[in-house]
Design a protein with these regions (language model features):
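Short acidic-glycine loop/turn motifs at beta-strand connectors
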Residues: 1, 7-12, 131-135
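General structural signal for secondary-structure boundaries
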Residues: 7, 33-34, 83-84
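C-terminal catalytic subdomain
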Residues: 48-74, 78-135
Length: 135
């Protein structure tokens, strides 16, 4: 599964997609919290896979980006290793090259050496950061 997240410079979460999975739907509906979702034994079960016959493509809300918004697109390894509020805090400010290096470092560290009280799941790690150029 993947993460799409949009945050403003001040840290306001403007958009987050719902994971196409039973755990993602349970999280979205409030049946479980983020902590329970990250550690759920079925967190890797997905209900929508690219290239399958039953694949569906959902178009989310149309949103206008502000000059200092940051868009994050990532594989599931980012939300499997950082809480959403941590991701927002890391990406909301700073040069994207530094933000990317910082994200990579903390995710790789948590994959190698999971710490109590923090998520940590070894997996492939892919992400894209985008921020509109100031007008």
């Amino acid at each position: 599964d993947s993460l799409i997240l949009l945050t403003g410079q001040r840290g306001r979460l403007k958009f987050q997609n719902t994971s196409h999975s039973p755990v993602g739907y349970a999280l979205e509906s409030g049946f479980i919290n983020e902590e329970e979702a990250i550690h759920h034994e079925e967190r890797n079960l997905v209900s929508n896979v690219i290239g399958t016959v039953g694949m569906s493509i959902e178009i989310g809300p149309e949103m206008e980006l502000s000059p200092r918004d940051t868009l994050v697109l990532s594989s599931d390894s980012l939300p499997d290793n950082l809480y959403v509020d941590e991701i927002v805090e890391y990406v909301r400010t700073g040069r994207l090259e530094r933000v990317a290096a910082r994200l990579t470092g903390i995710v790789e560290q948590r994959m190698r050496n999971p710490e109590p009280g923090h998520p940590g799941h070894s997996d492939d790690f892919t992400f894209i950061l985008y921020r509109p150029a100031p007008g």
